[in-house]
Amino acid sequence: MLLSKITFFERFEHDILSGTKTITLRDEAESHVITGQILPVSTFETDRWFCDIQIIDVTPVKLTELTEVHAKQENMTLPQLCDVIAEIYPGLEQLFMIRFRILSQ
């Protein structure tokens, strides 16, 4: 079943709105989106809407395959990105990279 919305931690809101965060790494349960799909974006903590995004593509990627390029697309260093992934998805190796663009407000 396709996702009907997507949430991000509040700490990522500014990076998304400024266009410096252009991907999100998710587990399989949160990877069910398709190219071209438009999703409302809300904060995880309070479910407050703050923008809409359009999905560019979805690509499987293993934790061990993450590079500085992925980190830059997340607006982080690679060690920061690996720490965040370990915090959110402890022990998970298989991720899905969802590339997106923010739609005009």
UniProtKB/Swiss-Prot annotation:
Keyword Transport attached: no
Domain ASCH: 7-93
GO cellular component terms, semicolon-separated: cytosol
Class of this enzyme: hydrolase
Enzyme Commission (EC) number: 3.5.1.135
Annotated active site: 21 (proton acceptor), 24 (nucleophile), 74 (proton donor)
Pfam families hit by this protein: ASCH
Function of the molecule: Catalyzes the hydrolysis of N(4)-acetylcytidine (ac4C).
One MF term in the entry's GO annotations: N4-acetylcytidine amidohydrolase activity
HAMAP family tied to this protein: ac4C_amidohydr (MF_00684)
Protein name: N(4)-acetylcytidine amidohydrolase
Catalytic activity as recorded in UniProt: N(4)-acetylcytidine + H2O = cytidine + acetate + H(+); N(4)-acetyl-2'-deoxycytidine + H2O = 2'-deoxycytidine + acetate + H(+); N(4)-acetylcytosine + H2O = cytosine + acetate + H(+)
Family to which the UniProt record says this protein belongs: Belongs to the N(4)-acetylcytidine amidohydrolase family.
Keyword terms: Hydrolase
